[in-house]
């Protein structure tokens, strides 16, 4: 059997009242290569995790809704046998509704106590969870109201996640969009739209405790296209023992209450090294979110847009085509290098920062160590009022620096002392 229309099968009604789980799982277990979910009369209702097999494509019509039943406390979709390797899985289309107002995962039930070991049987509040898959594709779908992450992946090689809309009610903390764990390689994550209540994209080589499906390197990842109106954090790279190498983040748009990029360690494995190599940002058009009326997502103006965490080692970091027009008062610098952090080479080019607020806005604040700093075609200015903010505020060490075509207006002159 090569193609199955689930509405033609017994046990699948799509009326929003009857449980469709058994019928949908029977379709997945039938050996069909393509399982089609047309738009039903209401929505598909599931009470247990649907399990896909190697070589399958689950193709839902764009507006076909799959909803998790109240009090199901289960992930919505995964691959078979996380202990073995699955290959060639495609998920396309649909609106995947985690119905979080009527679920409780252990993370929230225990007062956000995540310091327990990872258990594959534990409900983590995730919508789509995949582990040990080669050639995985997830595209053209909406992720709605998870307890925690929209997509969680570990041990994945050759993958694409693209054309994803996040329709989150922001009811819970830790509501990531696309969350990767260790041993994920050769992936493209693109065209993500909508606000989450934590990281839109998390590349966590080490995660710690409850959520740590795997530990290991993350390499060769492209993130291209993130749009948020009032986001939390666009991209996180977390290394606490395992390296992250060769990552490109491009075309990020919007305002963020927390960070644009959160880079480095989080002390989930104390004493282990945090190392990121060859990191490129290209086309970042972001600012601080104005104070929200209802700050469910938190509001932390003291964080820079780009934060290199203390005790983090970055071998090479490039920021190209960065534009920020800021209206929010009392915000942190654009780029912050934390105490004890080291960046071998930091190159920034084609950057424009305009401060419309009355308070200072520094471009770069270094509290760590930068071996080589290069600024090229950078323009920073503060509109009106007294001179305020600095291009480079250096409270650490800069061994070598080179500036070319740097323009400042109504700021202090560039700090050219190492």
PLM ranges: what are they?
Residues 1-418:
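Extracellular/periplasmic carbohydrate-active domains that bind, remodel
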């Amino acid at each position: 059997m090569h193609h199955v229309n689930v509405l033609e099968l017994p046990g699948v009604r799509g009326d929003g009242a009857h449980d469709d789980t058994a019928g949908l799982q029977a379709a997945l277990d039938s050996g069909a290569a393509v399982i089609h979910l047309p738009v039903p009369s209401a929505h598909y209702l599931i009470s247990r995790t649907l399990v896909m097999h190697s070589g399958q494509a689950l193709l839902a019509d764009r507006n076909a809704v799959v909803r998790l039943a109240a009090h199901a406390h289960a992930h919505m979709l995964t691959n078979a046998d996380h202990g073995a390797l699955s290959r060639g899985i495609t998920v396309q289309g649909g609106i995947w509704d985690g119905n979080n107002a009527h679920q409780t995962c252990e993370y929230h039930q225990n007062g956000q106590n995540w310091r327990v070991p990872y258990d594959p049987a534990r409900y983590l509040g995730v919508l789509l969870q995949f582990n040990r898959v080669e050639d995985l594709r997830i595209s053209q779908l909406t992720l709605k109201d998870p307890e925690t992450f929209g997509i969680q992946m570990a041990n994945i090689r050759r993958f694409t996640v693209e054309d994803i809309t996040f329709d989150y009610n922001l009811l819970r903390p830790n509501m990531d969009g696309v969350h990767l764990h260790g041993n994920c390689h050769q992936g493209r994550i693109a065209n993500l739209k909508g606000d989450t209540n934590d990281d839109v994209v998390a590349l966590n080589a080490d995660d710690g405790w409850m959520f740590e499906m795997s530990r290991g390197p993350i390499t060769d990842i492209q993130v291209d296209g993130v749009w948020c109106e009032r986001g939390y954090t666009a991209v996180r790279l977390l290394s606490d023992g395992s390296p992250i190498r060769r990552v490109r983040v491009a075309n990020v748009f919007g305002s963020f209450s927390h960070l644009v990029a959160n880079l480095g360690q989080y002390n989930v494995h104390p004493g282990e090294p945090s190392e990121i190599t060859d990191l490129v940002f290209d086309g970042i058009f972001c600012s601080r979110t104005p104070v929200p009326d209802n700050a469910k997502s938190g509001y932390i103006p003291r964080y820079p847009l780009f934060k290199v965490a203390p005790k983090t080692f970055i071998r090479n970091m490039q920021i190209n085509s960065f534009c920020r027009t800021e209206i929010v008062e009392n915000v942190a610098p654009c780029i912050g290098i934390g105490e004890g952090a080291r960046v071998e080479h930091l190159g920034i080019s084609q950057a424009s920062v305009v401060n419309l607020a009355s308070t200072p806005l520094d471009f770069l604040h270094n509290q760590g160590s930068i071996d080589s700093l290069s600024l090229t075609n950078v323009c920073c200015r503060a509109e009106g009022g007294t001179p305020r903010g600095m291009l480079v505020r250096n409270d650490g060490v800069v061994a070598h620096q080179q500036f070319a075509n740097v323009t400042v207006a109504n700021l202090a002159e560039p700090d050219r002392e190492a």
